[in-house]
Amino acid sequence: MSVFPGSVEAAAIEDSLAAHAATVLAVGASDLGKAGRRLMTAIRDQHLAHAAALRTTDPTDPNTAAPSAQGRTPAASPSTSPSGKKPGFAKAVDQLVAAESRAAVAHRARAMTTKGLACLLWGSLAVSSTQLTAVLRGADLAGDSPDPTAATVAAPRTRAPMPLVPVVQAEQEMVRQLHAIVYGYQLALGRLTGARRDTAAAELRRHRILRDRLTARLLNRKAEVPVADAAYVPSTNPRNATSAAKLIRQMETALVPFCGLWLAASTAPAERTEALDQVGRTLGVARRWGASLPAWPGWKLA
């Protein structure tokens, strides 16, 4: 049975990350608060889900259930130092953060040298580790009442199969989504004040710039440019600051899989880099507005 290129090494990375998270849980029994334990458990489970997927014959197909010749994912066990002694809690957390950062670099390197759904697979794992690094650095692992604006890490969920479309079609879909998002941000801005309004206004400008850049690219390709509808029905009607923030969170979260579609469709290295960065940036914005970090950034969920 064939092995998906790069999956052996990547599965080992994900196993190691799961083991690091298990170590934090093991040595931090008296240090972790309830929220910290939930966070570390979710991180461990996400990495185990990654490793399990990487051990299938085709990790880019969520419907692939058969394991490859690599076998099944082993349970993660706490790591120890060369002397056999477990690290302290703070050191264990630092080791996990460092390992996440290294994993992000390794996965991104694979994404930049592949194309299609393989590029999305590695890009998704890279964004996941990048975002988890940020979450861990900002987390109050010992606190039971964390900052309500801090995002959570979601339990792993099954991916939906991702279609592979021509790059022009992916760019057109991005423009359609950005038209709707610009409209939604304009609604939300009317209910926000102070720093949150400034943040939303900056994101609105960013979306307009991206939409204009993709529009120009489509025109250069002599492709049809989608036009904005006269109005859109928002997923949440922004009646106050709370519902305005919810609308932004929903819009940014919904955009991430379209960025993933664009990443899978990208053909030129520069565009691949741009699309991957957009997956991470959009997810980061959604997270700052309270979204949970999914196990597979850029993929639609089943």
Describe every region a protein language model picked out.
Residues 1-302:
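All-alpha RGS (Regulator of G-protein Signaling) helical domain and cognate RGS-like helical scaffolds
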